[in-house]
């Protein structure tokens, strides 16, 4: 188990000790669970603000690269926001609907459409020669943009692939590379930094692409019961009181179960929590993430943030 601090938050020793205990407790309920499979970034904020270094937090295995599944859609949403601000893309009803469906409903079809717009590439059969080289160059535009942001915590991440129900095929499969070496890859700190940007560093105007609004979750039990893909049940949101305000984006496939969440507790303390669970056994488990969130929330009810 490796603990790290990153530049966008201040390290809290108290939270670090608490997280160690929380993760140990959560893993103790299943003999097959190991802290080495889990990556966590946890940050507390006094209030919403636009200043870096405001949050206090901690992390475990938070530099470890894993397949992010649908967590990567946070990156694509932020890219769309910046493309629009730069005038590269025009804001339209269709674009708004695509980003909403990608973030709120986790639609892979919407994600595919958006990546086509962001990169000027399309899926299809394999191509060769100059066409193929140009295609790969274009598809890497999002990674180039991430690099140009010069955020230390984004170093080494790979966000250039579409998300699939039953793919990839053709040029998309070839772009994955030998042994899937070019699959998307993120760590919990990079996901946390992207979510922090969406939640507190963007000053949304009336006609902006409101990414934050697309991540808002409904915790009403009746609503959740009628939506089997609600990104709450089996994820962090399930472990939180139903009365809180929650924004989140989950990621789930046969190999992983992840979640990234932002909420406010009764003391107006803002919490950002990203948990990556890597392995088929976690993908099938629906109790681990809610337990982590419950323990973090209860700690925060007693927690006094440093000045």
Predicted regions and their residues:
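Short, conserved catalytic-motif segment at the N-terminal edge
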Residues: 32-65, 81, 85
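Active-site SXXK
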Residues: 66-89, 102, 273
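Active-site-adjacent helix/loop patches that line small-molecule binding or acyl-intermediate pockets
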Residues: 3, 7-37, 94-189, 197
